Amino acid sequence: MILSLLFLFVITLYFLIPSRISKINKNIPGPIGYPIVGNLFQINKNVVKSIDGFYKEFGPVYRLRMGNIETVVLTGIDTLEESFLFNKHSFVDRFVKKSRKINNGLDIIHSNGEYWKILKTIFQTQMTPRKIKSYQFEIQSQVDLMAEQLYKSKNNDNIVTNINENMKFMLFNIMSILIFGKQSIYCNNTNNINNKDDDDVDKEKKHIIFSIGRFFKTSGSLFYSDFIPILLPFDLINLSRNNFFKDFQVLTNFVSKNVNQQLSKLNDNNNNNKEKEGEERKSIVEAYLENYLNGEIKFESVLSSCTNLLLAGTDSSANTLSFLLVSLINNPEIQEKVYNEIITNLKNDEISINDRFKCPYTCAVIKETHRLYSIAPLSEPHYCSNDVEIKGFKIAKGTQIIQNIYSSSRSEQYWDKPLSFIPERFIDNANIKEKNKNIVSFGLGLRGCIGKSFAEYMIFLTVVRLIKNYKFSNPSPNQPLKEIGEYGLVMNCANYNAKIEKRK
């Protein structure tokens, strides 16, 4: 009994006695919290909307106390630039919550310091413009296959369903080719998600893609034990109910199969003293495994980093393309402008990265999609590695930092009619250079999205192939398609139906 009371007393002191961090952060505005829990229970299940609401009340720099974790939320283009560009070294590290230590902090997203730099450099060596361009045929083939399957699945009224799921199939195949190479398990199978007679391989692929979506949804929830460790049993119950661990196991099993397949191949080549000749590129897993075999990184980093890349590349890009298509369907005049620009300026099927400059309106549509839908609305949190001043407020070393990309992309301070889809804002506006800088959907600073260049090329190529060959329209023109996504770690586009017609 005495030990229990003593333990309770120590815990209470731990939460109630002001720390160095809280003393420094005390002048930052924010909502008044409760003892021990702080502001945790003032954040509802829709974390993104809660963060947005606090921004509207307290401004671009505000403080939250989440259990025993001091947190500062940064919003607004100028605030994010001051923080992650001009003070980039103060915010380069990730704040690794307990729920993110599922990979022991050895993956490319959650690692820090020199080890993270090694993982990042390995990836970037495979993302040169020339190597990205070399994926054109594979991307184009997957886009055409997906579009053909959509067209074949239309009913008598030319209506197709499950568009977002088909997008995810396509992106899963593209990311498998990028990460694991042409011989990756499943990557050469069809995309037809509407076929009821799929073989076992396609059924397993469907299950993997479903697990990716559900994993992202669960990961976007608030895990209370990240901030109050004693609540871990309750979180574990909820995570089990939401299949968090089951989904993660499905993903790691798939990645492990492909990684071990490539490792065996590399070992065979090394044993036979075989060297590759004349290859323009390596798969991502091959690049990581070579560094593992040289003793530069741990095998766990190969597995977890490939899992990171597969997750992020599949779900975020698929949802971006799905939202883009929704906007083109709801705004048919914009879709026709994109089509006319493509057929006028791109005469052949060879699409390079530089061809984006020939299609400014198409690029404006893509930028507007990134702005309006903010696929990664809060990104992953950062760690403040030293005391720093932002917008006149002192932020203490050790503070968790959140990039509020969602509110920054929808603030009336930076955008006219921020909730409307207006690509022309990137073309007609006199201050176009400033507007281009305002696209923060890939994050800012040293920890911005490492796959940005590949994603931009892949999205551009997909839009060109789809809109050049097909016209998409609303089966019920008087009822616009739903443009509001489901919030999680990424914004998920709801499935929708559309009419599809081949262009003449």
Swiss-Prot record:
Name of the protein described by the UniProt record: Probable cytochrome P450 513F1
Broadest EC class assigned to this enzyme: oxidoreductase
EC number(s) per entry: 1.14.-.-
GO cellular component, one term: membrane
Originating organism: Dictyostelium discoideum
Membrane topology, record value: Single-pass membrane protein
Localization (cell): Membrane
Transmembrane segment boundaries: 1-21
Source species, domain of life: Eukaryota
Protein family: Belongs to the cytochrome P450 family.
MF terms (GO), sorted A to Z: heme binding; iron ion binding; monooxygenase activity; oxidoreductase activity, acting on paired donors, with incorporation or reduction of molecular oxygen
Keyword terms of this UniProt record: Heme, Iron, Membrane, Metal-binding, Monooxygenase, Oxidoreductase, Transmembrane, Transmembrane helix
Chief localization: membrane
InterPro entries the UniProt entry points to: Cyt_P450, Cyt_P450_CS, Cyt_P450_E_grp-I, Cyt_P450_sf
Cofactor list: heme
Gene3D superfamilies according to UniProt: Cytochrome P450
Pfam families: p450
